[in-house]
A protein has these predicted regions:
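Bacterial N-terminal signal peptides that target proteins for export
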Residues: 2-13
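N-terminal signal peptide c-region/cleavage motif recognized by signal peptidases
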Residues: 21-24
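N-terminal small/polar-rich segments of proteins
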Residues: 26-84, 129-144, 148-264, 301-334
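A surface-exposed loop-and-adjacent beta-strand signature within N-terminal beta-sandwich domains
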Residues: 81-123, 279
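Surface patches in mature domains of proteins
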Residues: 87-102, 252-276
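Short proline/glycine- and polar residue-rich coil/turn motifs
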Residues: 115-124, 217, 294-301
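Outer membrane beta-barrel transmembrane domains
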Residues: 269-293, 302-303
């Protein structure tokens, strides 16, 4: 019985060793010689809130099997080229950004940062982050970093090791040494990345419900004048469209539907106090012709659109009593 047990254990150990070798064959750390990273942020959101933390690839990636006991993961980087300024090539506008490392600590040109620790090391792409301060009001478009982000990486990540003895993924020239003797960070490996920020068109819409009130006959419901406020991205003219509501009749005729039956009360919406219908397509309303602040596209000033809602049902007085309502969708088009 004892002899069989010993043979079984020996076979298990051999099998375990084979599995370990197979996994290590797929493990590696690498530094990207070139790459492009881009983030997107809506323009009004950027101005009001900024962008707290958008992730991008730092250039260092480690993948595969790692089994280490009582071993230090050595990791250091030095920033050799970078810019906190991003430029829109079409307009010349600038965005200011803050770059942070995987510990959410700000990095700067020429900085050398030791991130060594008793861990298994990175698992996948090691992230960096971009933070955009609030208060920046810029046109939509692509903003490219004024210079690439060049980082020199120094690393020694344990794959399989016990107390300094084993297999390590290492940057060029790295030497762990022994007992503190012969340690050398080596020459490192360079990553070079191009960063860009895409600022998206964005708007804020302020609209209120229209209430005709109550009348004995629908024909006695007076027209209601209201106003809608819209502000959009810097240097971005736009159009405002209204759809035909939930229950259009005879094509594009807007109509309110009874809450209790299948009857309708026709109405429509007109620009300012005119008979110029506000709709979609050729009936859109240009921001250049807004009632208040037309053509002011600075991202801060609101355009106001005064409109009049009228009952237009020729048979309004035959419509049964009840509560009628509709929902109209506002669409901003750039």
């Amino acid at each position: 019985m004892n002899i069989k047990t010993k043979k079984l254990l020996r076979h298990l150990c051999m099998f375990s060793g084979l599995m370990l070798t197979g996994n290590m064959a797929h493990a590696a750390c690498s530094v990207s010689a070139s790459g492009t990273s881009s983030i997107s942020v809506p323009s009004i959101y950027l101005m009001e809130n900024g962008e707290n933390s958008s992730q991008f690839n730092s250039g260092l990636s480690c993948t595969g099997f790692s089994l280490a006991l009582a071993n230090m993961t050595y990791l250091k980087y030095r920033v050799e080229q970078m810019s906190n300024s991003f430029t829109n090539a079409q307009t010349g506008e600038k965005l200011n950004a803050i770059i942070l490392d995987s510990n959410n600590e700000i990095i700067s040109l020429g900085q050398e940062k030791d991130m060594s620790s008793f861990t298994r090391g990175p698992d996948g792409n090691l992230p960096f982050y971009i933070r955009l301060p609030a208060g920046q009001s810029v046109s939509p478009g692509v903003y490219q970093a004024d210079s690439p982000l060049k980082v020199k990486w120094f690393y020694s990540v344990p794959a399989v090791a016990i107390v300094g003895i084993g297999v390590f993924f290492e940057s060029p020239g790295f030497r762990r040494g022994a007992l503190g003797i012969g340690f050398n960070w080596g020459s490192g490996a360079d990553s070079l990345g191009s960063l860009s920020i895409t600022v998206l068109p964005d708007c804020r819409i302020l609209a209120q419900d229209v209430n005709f009130g109550t009348a004995a006959f629908a024909s006695k419901l007076e027209p209601v004048q209201s106003s809608m406020g819209i502000r959009c991205s810097v240097n971005t003219p736009y159009y405002v469209s209204l759809n035909n509501g939930l229950s259009p009749q005879n094509g594009n005729q807007r109509a309110m539907k009874s809450q209790t039956g299948n009857t309708f009360l026709k109405y429509d919406i007109f620009k300012n106090s005119s008979n110029d219908r506000w709709g979609s397509g050729n009936e859109r309303w240009s921001s250049l012709n807004a009632t208040i602040n037309p053509g002011v596209h600075n991202g801060v000033t609101q355009q106001n659109y005064v409109f009049t809602t009228k009952i237009v049902d020729e048979n309004a007085d035959t419509v049964p009593a009840g509560t009628y309502q509709d929902t109209v969708t506002v669409q901003v088009e750039f």
